Amino acid sequence: MPPNITALNTTRARTYVFRLPLFTRVVIIAIVGFWLAGLQSIVDIQQWGALIPDEMGLATLYRMNTFPFIHLNIFHAVMNILALTPLMERFEAEYGTLNCLALFFGPLTTIPAFLYIGLEKFVFGNNVAVMGASMWVFLLLGVEAVKTYKVNPNFVIGTYSIPTWTTPIGVLFAMAVLVPSSSFWGHAAGLVIGYGGMFSSTLNKKEKRQCADVKGVAGLGYVKFLAPPEKILRWIEGKLNLLGRLPHYVSIDQKTYGRFGVLPSNNTPAAASPGVALGLVGSTQRLGP
């Protein structure tokens, strides 16, 4: 029996990896590639691509897009890959590959990077460099926590009812205690932007009023404004025939709940429940011509 269980787990893991969507695969490959590039001694990859507040200028703005791919060592890279992969593949399956490309090489990386630089340089007066995909991890944890809050607002511990959207905050402080060398403010910047991108778009008017005292920046719901126009994405997909050319590509018509993470209503049939739908994450099914 144990060998069969081991074989089953291995098969499921292999199937999961083979079904990862395109952008998620590219991110993983890039992280591994930058780690391999850092093994040579000619160019200091960490110094070249890390997010260093005092090194930022017009000529070094590229750091805002390179720092998530660069890691201190193989352990750092592997841990971030394991944490990031399930979160990124869910996001890509819902929003689409082109959306992920535009958002993660744009506002979902640069906004938390600017926020971190502002805090580190102008508030604390420090120059602590950060690198690694953990900022993305906390950003996506914020996104997932808010979506979970919509379905299950609270969980109970003893006699205390705790809002589910606060779970990543607990993870944030636990990480700061367990890994003191990690960047608390870098993680916090990602988490704030993750909350801000989803909170407003997943709450109804009554819930928005109830949460007005805690949502802060989250009320912006800026994903609707930062995501590329759907007409442009459809035009690019059709013009370049991305569905026909790129395996594991996730198109606009392939996403689970629609463009901005609209969750099913209470009247949605059981077959369309969140648990069932997430089982399709990473599917390579192609729709259209």
Curated annotation (Swiss-Prot):
GO: which molecular function terms?
serine-type endopeptidase activity
Q: Which InterPro entries match?
A: Peptidase_S54_rhomboid_dom, Rhomboid-like_sf
Q: Where found in the cell?
A: Golgi apparatus membrane; Golgi apparatus, cis-Golgi network membrane
Q: What residues form the catalytic site here? A: 134, 187
Q: Where are the transmembrane segments?
A: 26-46, 67-87, 100-120, 122-142, 157-179, 184-203
**What Enzyme Commission number(s) apply to this enzyme?**
3.4.21.105
**Which keywords appear in this protein's UniProt record, sorted alphabetically?**
Golgi apparatus, Hydrolase, Membrane, Protease, Serine protease, Transmembrane, Transmembrane helix
The record describes its membrane topology as:
Multi-pass membrane protein
Q: What does this protein do?
A: Probable rhomboid-type serine protease that catalyzes intramembrane proteolysis.
Concerning its family, UniProt says:
Belongs to the peptidase S54 family.
- Entry protein name: Rhomboid-type serine protease 2
The species is: Podospora anserina (Pleurage anserina)
